[in-house]
Amino acid sequence: PAVLESARLLLDSLRHEAMGEEATQAEMATKYAEYFPRFVKHGVKIGLLNEALLQFDMGKLGAALVPSRDLQFGYLGLQTLYDRYFLVDQYVGGRRFELPQCFFMRVAMGLALNEVEREARAIEFYNVLSTFDFMSSTPTLFNSGTQRSQLSSCYLTTVSDDLDGIYEAIKENALLSKFAGGLGNDWTPVRALGAYIKGT
């Protein structure tokens, strides 16, 4: 169908943009494993990825990538990843340098950073994510493995009934929403409209 053909053409374009060269689906069997360590090192170099990712065995993780899983995407899914989730190199005119399987492994590595057997756990996470058996929330997909490890979707806070508490809650909301966290505030402790406030 035309939709699948559009997705394949977009995939070709993404590969060319990220790797700087064209590659067929068959060639990606080796190219993904070769490109993956370069992707991680470049992300660390430009300050987007957490330096701790360099401690992983890149050869092992690169070998675990399954290029055929790129073909699971329809056009809209692939375009959404490109537009909203892939890492962007602002130093090179906004070039996306992340590919679908690199994206899933980057997220998996971020989730496995504190695991004892981190390569094994990263591969397990990668396999459930890249097969769509499980999908993490948007903040996790945005931030896992990056310098900002804010992975939660929602934060619930209680605002205290004083000037410091109200403005502290506003500040916390701004910082949390900066990295895609959803917010819920309990304003119950704050006195009602028209209530007496001691002043000068």
Label for each model-derived stretch:
Residues 1-200:
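Extended catalytic cores of very large enzyme megasubunits
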